[in-house]
Amino acid sequence: MRFLIAAAASCTALATPLAAQSVFDTNVRAAPQFLTYQIKAPVNETISEFTTPIFVVIPINSTLTFDVGTAFASARVKPNGPGTEQTSTISGLTDTQIRANLSFGSDFVVVTAGVNIPTGKETATQEELLAAFRIGNDFLAFPISNMGTGFGATGGIAIARPIGSWNFGFGGSLRQSASYEPFVANTGTRPRFQPGNEYRARVGLDHPFGTGRFAVGLTYSKFGNDDIGGSIYNTGDRYIAQAGFNNSLGGANVLVNAWNLYRSSGMIFTGERTGAENIANILLGIGFHGMSGVIEPSVELRNWTQEQLPASMLGTIGLRYSVDAAGFAITPSAGYTFGRFAAVGGNADLSGFRAALAIRFGS
């Protein structure tokens, strides 16, 4: 999902010097995931995605770190209705992101520079278009929300300072993207898409609480006008609020995370408003120590409101198990989702299943 929910929290950093690091402290992370939803009438679709993201963190020294990430993804939309619609699939490598982080003054100031290398599938055929479109839905929150875009570059700075027992952080960034051809039209033409610039500002606070922490953050993203084939439109600005809390309680670890994404109304090329939307999410997890690891059942609730449509809602019951062994951190997880999905023709019952295996090797 493109929320970048962690962005607000990334502004806060502990105001303590980093331990000495080198390339020998490189760590590798992978997280194969499968997510599927079955949406009943009037939508009548099963939407599935399998992804294998890989992320490598390479610390050069205590102040300079590089990270590289990419993924393989395969998405599928299968119509379940009585019609003759064809199944839509799209798969392949996604874009590759390379980022450098340079810190100053005991990590009080962090300068970030990143590039998006278009190694993914940036152009969807007519047969692939439905699958490419469906995985971009913010409410359904697929792990990979697009298969590829053009070249892009991002630069940013974040500053964190202790204020008494609190840590306060703020930052900003700018992203510029090159044009690309996102799809093949039914006429065979390939419209050129030029994304507008993205400007982002972030602010966050965190504070120790018992054995854990309490953190809040706010991210504002402003988007310039997009141009596709000479038609100008705007997707609307986004506001992301986030709060998180974790602490020990009676031998268990309690985790509460909440976020809210508000997108202001955009505008299509005719001058018509697209309408605002809001997605709210809360997750409660309780971790129990046992069997050489931590077992964590969780409950997650999400609500999506749009103009001129009923609210969409879903709930997910999940379970994960975390264990560290021989330099590896392994976390398998699974969850079942149920709810309703608002569509033009009425509400559709929704159910789904997800499974993931997160693996980290290295320090």
Regions found by a protein language model. Name each.
Residues 1-25, 362-363:
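Cleavable N-terminal export/targeting peptides
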Residues 20-27, 57-67, 103-112, 149, ...:
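Short loop/turn motifs that connect adjacent beta-strands in outer-membrane beta-barrel proteins
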Residues 20-59, 63-78, 113, 134, ...:
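Short glycine/proline- and aromatic-enriched beta-strand/turn motifs that initiate or cap beta-hairpins
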Residues 37-47, 148-151, 193-194, 303-307:
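Short, charged, low-hydrophobicity "junction" segments
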Residues 79-88:
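A cross-kingdom feature marking solvent-exposed beta-strand/loop segments within repeated
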Residues 87-208, 217, 224-236, 243, ...:
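Outer-membrane pore/translocation modules
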Residues 180-183, 187-363:
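Outer membrane beta-barrel transmembrane domains
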